[in-house]
Every structure is written in structure tokens, then in C-alpha cells.
């Protein structure tokens, strides 16, 4: 799948040169991190993180896999999601998560449920079609506040 979007300021203007640090679990729901003690398999072909930069239009695009859900506590299963930390001089650093549309587990996610309806909508990507090769594209725009 592909994730594409733009980094914008609060007025809708593009933020070029924003550093986007992203990380996620693999398709089995396991992070490539020493503190993830899951018994799910690691994928030697999947790094699980990247640092990219928004272009002159604020745009970004990357290819990844759909992360797997994973248990996070007593009766709590995290839905598939990606983590983003976005930073640009002159703006307040944003750390957030991107969720996928139409995921049943979104309704029960303890972190997502803490957010207002408008915040939840901003955190859920939208379907943006498929590539010529049949790969799903999701759209996720990120808004930074000026410092």
C-alpha cells in the first residue's frame, strides 16, 4: 500500500521541508524494537520505520505494509495504525497516529476514543484509490501549528 498526503499549516499552506519520522508494526503486529516481546514473527524484509521530508508542496508519499493489530493490555487490541512525529523549525512538533478507515477495532481503541470526533476524523486516513498495479492508496494530511 501507499500512504500519501501533505504537511500543512493551520491556514492550509504547504509546509515544505518538514521532517516526518514514522514507525509501525509489521503485518503480524510486531515492532522491530527490543522492548516488543511479542511472540509474533519478525519480518527480515521489513524495517518498520523511515524518516522522510515533505517536498515543496508539503507532499509526501511512501510504500509500506498494512500493520497488524496487536494486544496492548487486558482486553485491549490496538487496531492497525502508523506513528508519525513531524517537525519543522518554526512549528510545534507533532506526534500522532494514523488509523485506517473502516477498521472495526478503531471503535474500541482506548487512545483514539480519548479524542474528540473532529480529532478522530483527522487521525483516520481516507481511501484514495488504487495504483495501476492494484495497490491501495491512503491519504493522510498533517497540520502543524506555528510556534
What spans do the regions from the language model cover?
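Beta-strand-dominated extracellular/periplasmic modules and repeats
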Residues: 1-147
